[in-house]
Amino acid sequence: MYSEQNPARHYIALTFVWLLLGAALGLHFPDVDTRFQWLISPRLLLHRSAVTHGLIVPSLLFLSARAKDKAPSFRSFVIGFSLASAVHLCFDFFPKGWVGFALIHVPLYGRTTALFSQAWIMLGVLACLYLAFLLARRLIELAFGAGILAASFIVSAAENAGSVLNALTLLIVAGVAVVTARRFRKAASEIIR
């Protein structure tokens, strides 16, 4: 039951729930075309679409969360969604071969090359992690975000046993790159001031 005497506990619980909800959706959103193929026309969305497998949807959610300074619940949802999407993309970066459905599909263009597909997925991983990091305003969001990232990885590892070590390595390297870029950006902005 909600206690007016302890709103911090209520905030923490809501933050966790919204992060978890965002992660649950973000972890499987890139494959929405295969899960709802009976609902979505293949002319609109094919597997590994650039629309779902990359930075487009997380970026739109990020802009929406920042533009209107929405409630912390929406911000938490977007953080969870972005982190889980990054995990999904880390596993998608290691297909059995860069041919056919492993390649990114651009609507109205078709399948791209292996190099473009790899670059697009890598850019998506970095963008998703960076956007989540930018949205986190409180230490509790960073702490829960780290937990959500780990939980998303565990769920994906159970579903994709073949490339666990590679995906983990990619996630760690991308995470270090994002933290380094954020610190560099912060230091550069302080020098400019």
Please state what every model-predicted region is.
Residues 1-193:
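N-terminal membrane-targeting hydrophobic helices
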